[in-house]
Amino acid sequence: DFTHRRTVFFVDQKYFVIVDEALGKAEGTVNLHFGLAPVKMDVDTDKHIIRTVANSPRNIFLQCVSTDKAELKEEEGWFSEVYRKKEKRPAYSINIAKGEKPVRTVTLIYPEKKDDTVKFTAKIVKADDNRLEVRVSVNGEKKDLKWNITTNQ
């Protein structure tokens, strides 16, 4: 008895907020995997932050917030630009123990300018079978993101 539900919000055509929900009574470990571009990474395992550090005016900031204790781990990652030739690339996973209660994570993917400092917070306001409400703050700008399925039974 396990359901994975993912909601993707594209906020103001600027950044993505992804909400992953692991629902049901199944037990084990919930893993969110991130395969990234083959560039240098700056990783903060305590805050669950991954930043690309490319020789570019723009990079990617990724942070995952969870309702439960989570662990950010480096893992093996590969990519291929040519058939039958694979090369290593950075890959990470967020790992969370799953019991009977739901596990929910909120991930920000934000295009970051050089020398930016991104501040991100997220809170699940409501979540059930028919609705999701999440409140996020990115660099002090608050947004309420939600969906609601109305059923006529």
Residue ranges and their predicted role:
Residues 1-153:
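CBM-like, beta-strand-rich accessory domains located in the C-terminal region of large
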